[in-house]
Amino acid sequence: MSSAALVPADDILEPTLQSILDQKSLRWIFVGGKGGVGKTTTSCSLAIQLAKVRKSVLLISTDPAHNLSDAFGQKFGKEARLVDGFDNLSAMEIDPSASMQDLLAAGGEQGEDMGFGLGGMMQDLAFSIPGVDEAMSFAEVLKQVKSLSYEVIVFDTAPTGHTLRFLQFPTVLEKGLAKLSQLSNQFGPMLNSVLGARGGLPGGQNLDEVLSKMESLRETISEVNAQFKDADLTTFVCVCIAEFLSLYETERMIQELTSYQIDTHAIVVNQLLFPGKDSTCEQCKARRKMQKKYLDEIAELYEDFNVVRMPLLVEEVRGKEKLER
């Protein structure tokens, strides 16, 4: 492909996501879209810019295929760690399957020792729940957010379908815990007497203690769920490329976000070509023509959105310096 069709890495195109940087009330920022459209690059760049204007920023990857470590060139894990070169930007990569294993390990072995067969049964049940990986990601996020104080949190999310389930999880879990609490009020005394006769729950807890912890979790989730639906506190940045499938996924995502009452008003269109008039690259010109068609559709569909057009660069966007541009 002719380099004349690309924009050098030093060039910067307007508009930007400046409105998000200026909105000082924002606490939760989600970045999502179809796989391979540049979500991680966008979320990393946004987090770096936020670190310039906010006291403390946490960047979290909830995608099982983590890319934050590759993007910044340093290793991240499930504990928040400062990004090299920053004193107010931290990052973490949540491993959902490992989180689930940790959760089950403590109670599972005790359950087996008691003869209930709880370990294997609970593990099979837990992993059969749709969206359980997003559920564990959310639980891990809550744990980190409660123990550490960050002014704004940026989520580098999984591909579209997983992201939407992740965002729906607070509502689903809140309803589920409320129903469980209702059932416990009706059948709690009877269950306590049965469990008491058989030695109680794993770890020596009784049902009331477990339900009390779950109620506390429900209250926390209810609070976060309310924040997710507050446009002053939460927004979702959609990332796409100027192709049919990506645009289709973006439209579906925006409709679902609207149904969840989650604010979204910014779209980043990545990998755009800008061939010069004297370019001899026919493939570049043809692709630019196709991209322009979908850019026109985006402009028509989302006239009230801040649409950010980003070029296809001549080099990989890796490392603090390139991400900062």
UniProtKB/Swiss-Prot annotation:
One Pfam family matching this protein: ArsA_ATPase
Q: Tell me which Gene Ontology terms the entry assigns under biological process.
A: tail-anchored membrane protein insertion into ER membrane
A GO cellular component annotation in the UniProt record? GET complex
Q: Which residues bind Zn(2+)?
A: C281, C284
The catalytic residues are D63
State where ATP binds. K34, G35, G36, V37, G38, K39, T40, T41, E243, N270
Which InterPro entries did the record assign? Anion-transp_ATPase-like_dom, ATPase_ArsA/GET3, ATPase_ArsA/GET3_euk, P-loop_NTPase
Q: Name one GO molecular function term.
A: ATP hydrolysis activity
- As given in the record, the signal peptide range reads none
Main function: ATPase required for the post-translational delivery of tail-anchored (TA) proteins to the endoplasmic reticulum. Recognizes and selectively binds the transmembrane domain of TA proteins in the cytosol. This complex then targets to the endoplasmic reticulum by membrane-bound receptors, where the tail-anchored protein is released for insertion. This process is regulated by ATP binding and hydrolysis. ATP binding drives the homodimer towards the closed dimer state, facilitating recognition of newly synthesized TA membrane proteins. ATP hydrolysis is required for insertion.
Family of the protein in this entry: Belongs to the arsA ATPase family.
Name the NCBIfam families on file. GET3_arsA_TRC40
Name by which UniProt lists this protein: ATPase GET3
In the record, what lineage is assigned to the organism producing the protein? Eukaryota, Fungi, Dikarya, Ascomycota, Pezizomycotina
